């Protein structure tokens, strides 16, 4: 009887993990300092509140992937959702556009958020 109860509990526990909650990422794009044309700065893309942890994040300049990008370690919040910070050095000017593109299982297509120099 005890063996049956243990097996039943193991089956229930394994089935409960099949329906893990998926959460779409929140994406925030901002510069470390207020933007000034010609003055070096850092472009940040903070991605938070997502689950599961598998995610792809790219910083873009004029729609093209920036290669020299660093990021924080993957971390999780009290609610077990994940967050990351991607960042790179850049020098803003009038003509270049910057953005952050995120791909995640909760998104049917990658989501791109543009940097607003006035934020």
Swiss-Prot record:
Disulfide bond positions: 45-100
Residues making up the signal peptide according to the UniProt record: 1-20
GO biological process: antigen processing and presentation of peptide antigen via MHC class I; immune response
UniProt domain Ig-like C1-type: residue ranges: 25-114
CDD domains for this protein: IgC1_beta2m (cd05770)
Alphabetical UniProt keywords: Disulfide bond, Immunity, Immunoglobulin domain, MHC I, Secreted, Signal
InterPro entries with a match to the protein in the record: B2Microglobulin, Ig-like_dom, Ig-like_dom_sf, Ig-like_fold, Ig/MHC_CS, Ig_C1-set, MHC/Immunoglobulin
Record keyword Disulfide bond present: yes
Keyword Secreted: yes
Locations listed in the record: Secreted
GO terms for cellular component: extracellular region; MHC class I protein complex
Domain of life: Eukaryota
Similarity comment text for this entry: Belongs to the beta-2-microglobulin family.
Subunit structure: Heterodimer of an alpha chain and a beta chain. Beta-2-microglobulin is the beta-chain of major histocompatibility complex class I molecules.
Matches recorded under PANTHER family: BETA-2-MICROGLOBULIN, MHC CLASS II-RELATED
Task of the protein: Component of the class I major histocompatibility complex (MHC). Involved in the presentation of peptide antigens to the immune system.
The protein, known as: Beta-2-microglobulin
Organism of origin: Aotus azarae
Protein's gene: B2M
């Amino acid at each position: 009887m005890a063996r049956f109860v243990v097996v039943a509990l193991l089956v229930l526990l394994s089935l409960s993990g099949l329906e893990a909650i998926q959460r779409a990422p929140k994406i925030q794009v901002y510069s470390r300092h207020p933007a000034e044309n010609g003055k070096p700065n850092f472009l940040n893309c903070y991605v938070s509140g997502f689950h599961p942890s598998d995610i792809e994040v790219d910083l873009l300049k004029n729609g093209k992937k920036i290669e020299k990008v660093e990021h924080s370690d993957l971390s999780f919040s009290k609610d077990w959702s994940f967050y990351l910070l991607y960042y790179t050095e850049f020098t803003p000017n009038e003509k270049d556009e910057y953005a952050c593109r995120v791909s995640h299982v909760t998104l049917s297509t990658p989501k791109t958020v543009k940097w607003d120099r006035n934020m």
